[in-house]
From Swiss-Prot:
UniProt KW keywords: Ribonucleoprotein, Ribosomal protein, RNA-binding, rRNA-binding
Pfam families per the UniProt record, alphabetical: Ribosomal_L20
A GO CC term assigned to this protein in UniProt: ribosome
Protein's name according to its UniProt entry: Large ribosomal subunit protein bL20
Biological process terms in GO annotation: ribosomal large subunit assembly; translation
Gene of this entry: rplT
Organism: Rhodopseudomonas palustris (strain BisB18)
SUPFAM superfamilies, A to Z: Ribosomal protein L20
Database matches in HAMAP family: Ribosomal_bL20 (MF_00382)
Intrachain S-S bonds: none
Key word Ribosomal protein present: yes
């Protein structure tokens, strides 16, 4: 049986790791052992932060909505309660965008929420 030398496959594997480690600093980009560890850790961070990104953006939308309804004499929680009572089914992302780009439309929604709270 012929002897199998793994130079080609090892080189291909290493090349794949180095490609993923491109842009890393120091030995993390060109030493296989540290590059592997760095790529693994980068993958862990990427996985974690894909989840965290959703939380962060939701918090940002809530802050923007809160800032937009405060001058109208409401807090965020009161505004959301008013929306629920009035039956307006607009998510926080859209509300946040409306507050920035279309203040008149946001004001109309806020008035509807206020009316539902009064009734």
């Amino acid at each position: 049986m012929a002897r199998v030398k793994r130079g080609v496959t090892a080189h291909a594997k290493h090349k794949k790791v180095y490609k993923l480690a491109k842009g890393f600093r120091g030995r993390r980009k060109n030493t296989i052992r540290t590059a592997k560890a760095a790529v693994d850790k980068a993958g862990q961070y990427a996985f974690r932060d894909r989840k965290r990104k959703k939380r962060t953006f939701r918090a940002l939308w809530i802050q923007r909505i809160n800032a937009a309804v405060r001058p109208l004499g409401m807090t965020y929680s009161v505004f959301i309660n008013g929306l629920a009572k009035s039956g307006v089914m607009v998510d926080r992302k859209v509300l946040s965008d409306l507050a920035i780009t279309e203040p008149a439309a946001f004001l109309a929604i806020a008035e509807k929420a206020k009316a539902a709270l009064a009734a």
